[in-house]
Curated annotation (Swiss-Prot):
Signal peptide: none annotated. One of its GO terms (molecular function) is NADH dehydrogenase (ubiquinone) activity. Disulfide bonds: none annotated. Core subunit of the mitochondrial membrane respiratory chain NADH dehydrogenase (Complex I) that is believed to belong to the minimal assembly required for catalysis. Complex I functions in the transfer of electrons from NADH to the respiratory chain. The immediate electron acceptor for the enzyme is believed to be ubiquinone. It catalyses: a ubiquinone + NADH + 5 H(+)(in) = a ubiquinol + NAD(+) + 4 H(+)(out). The keyword Transmembrane helix applies. It is an enzyme of class 7 (translocase). This is NADH-ubiquinone oxidoreductase chain 1. Its main location: mitochondrion. The chain crosses the membrane at residues 3-23, 68-88, 100-120, 136-156, 172-192, 223-243, 253-273, 293-313.
Length: 318
């Protein structure tokens, strides 16, 4: 039964990722006054399936000088982590109810750095290695901000349990009292998922295509799926932390629908940002974090620690 639950969790995520690629191409197309994919199926709806068939039927090649085991493991690890990270998420019921759900999500998102590093190193080529080193530096840097913001939210929430966030936000979404944190969180998730304007790992003019230059067919598709699954999970987490997922015992399907709607709006905002902004320079990227975000998040973290003590009250407990 547990295997069935797992499959019923994974298949919709993979379908959502497949259609997100189509939505991205359509949105970018209309923002640039063109149509986007419109040949395969009605309105191009079958385009993701055509892409999947093409990618998974091609022969997976690898460079002669590459480390084959690590080269193969990297995309597998990336996709496994991207799918595992969904398990503690209450929508409104989770597959695994963890007491430290937020720490679990943070730990798994940090592990994705290894798949990027392995892919760049195992390719034994200068462009993938340069892209991988950039990606690792960027991801680890922005993990710091994400962790401090999560700590601040946990001070308000009173625990690391994701379900407790639903109770905390019954009367007011946390985006209202903690809007600076929400703003920095959203920008940090853009950097964490290597999306524009922080897509320095895939700078076509500098690095050809970043850490996955040498990948073809199935392994390339696995990296692609992992990237888009991470975008969706980050937006799901943003919804959970700041946009108060409602919970009604009688209408659980409505709860899931509202949760998904908020998540979809945030995902479309990701695409809007990609269509609107040029890529940052590497020094600007690091300056934004270490000189702007880090001091602000530390100050706000101290603020949210001191406020309950100053007002002689405690966070809500289950």
């Amino acid at each position: 039964m547990f295997i069935m639950n797992l499959l019923l969790y994974i298949i919709p995520i993979l379908l959502a990722v497949a259609f997100l690629t189509l939505i991205e191409r359509k949105v970018l197309g209309y923002m640039q006054f063109r149509k986007g994919p419109n040949v395969v199926g009605p309105y191009g709806l079958l385009q993701p399936f055509a892409d999947a068939v093409k990618l998974f039927t091609k022969e997976p090649l690898h460079p002669l000088s590459s480390s084959v085991l690590m080269y193969t493991l990297a995309p597998t690890l990336a996709l496994t982590l991207a799918l595992t990270i969904w398990t503690p998420l209450p929508m409104p019921y989770s597959l695994v109810d963890l007491n430290l759900g937020l720490l679990f999500i943070l730990a798994l998102s940090s592990l994705s750095v290894y798949s990027i590093l392995w892919s760049g190193w195992a390719s034994n080529s200068k462009y993938p290695l340069a892209g991988a080193l950039r990606a690792v530096a960027q991801t680890i840097s922005y993990e710091v901000t994400l962790a401090i913001i999560l700590l601040s939210i946990m001070m308000i929430n009173g625990s690391f349990t994701l379900k407790n966030l639903i109770i905390t936000q019954e009367n007011m979404w946390l985006i209202v009292p903690a809007w600076p944190l929400a703003m920095m969180w959203f920008i940090s998730t853009l950097a964490e998922t290597n999306r524009a304007p922080f897509d320095l790992t895939e700078g076509e003019s500098e690095l050809v295509s970043g850490f996955n230059v040498e990948y073809t067919a199935g392994p390339f598709a696995m990296f692609f799926l992992a990237e888009y699954a991470n975008i969706i999970i980050m937006n799901a987490l943003t919804t959970m932390l700041f946009l108060g997922p409602s919970f009604n015992q009688d209408f659980t399907h409505v709860n899931t629908f509202t949760f998904m709607t908020k998540m979809m709006i945030l995902t479309l905002t990701f695409l809007w940002v990609r269509a609107s902004y040029p890529r940052f320079r590497y020094d600007q990227l690091m300056q934004l974090l270490w000189k702007n975000f880090l001091p602000m998040t530390l100050a706000l973290c101290l603020w949210f620690i001191s406020i309950p003590m100053a007002l002689a009250c405690v966070p809500p407990q289950i």
